[in-house]
């Protein structure tokens, strides 16, 4: 998958870490974070490699967690 911008996994993981919602955050905020986590895992999986299947599973789990939070 060609991307117009260079993907730097370390920068993306660091940003995700620092934007993680704290205790008491609204469900919508936490769900949005899980969606961002899912997108990151999808991008990692798109680069292929031996962990691609596991990364896709993590993306799916993140999206499902977000869906449940939005539904509550």
How would you name each of these model-derived features?
Residues 1-72:
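Long, non-catalytic architectural segments outside compact domain cores
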